[in-house]
Amino acid sequence: SEKILPGSGLEHESLDTTHFSVADKNGNIVSNTYTLNSGFGSGVVIDGTGILMNNEMDDFVSAPGVPNQFGLIGGEANKIEPFKRPLSSMTPTIILKEGKPIYATGSPGGSRIITTVLQFLLNTLVFKMEISDATVAPRIHHQWKPDVLMLETGFDIQHASKIESLGQKIYF
């Protein structure tokens, strides 16, 4: 960890986000997503605790139109200013039915969290897939900038070829 300096980024999105959902016998549900944002967070450890500080400040735009460490391009609305929260993809979700919690989910995955959670919910609640099948189902992701459709391994190649023939850039 001595080689990791504050603000150091990783070449690829890291595995430093986690999500957990828990429920108790009384029907209380928690959906929690936590992130360091990149390997070793900001690289700053609170003296005497071993606690790493995250680097969520990277979720702000340092300059409109300039990509952050994950290649996300932000605009004027997400620039750093006092009393603001940065745009975040974290999507801890609790589904209610008649005012009572019935379902909790979320995911790690950086910019892909929102589309991952949406596709998981569609697969389980609308298409009635088993949770285990929905968890491993290949997903698609597009975030506007960069204009690339990301397809996970296992996505039907024939569908991908058809989409590509329409002029859409695809990344597997």
Regions from the PLM with identified roles:
Residues 9-172:
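Proteins synthesized as precursors that undergo proteolytic processing into mature forms
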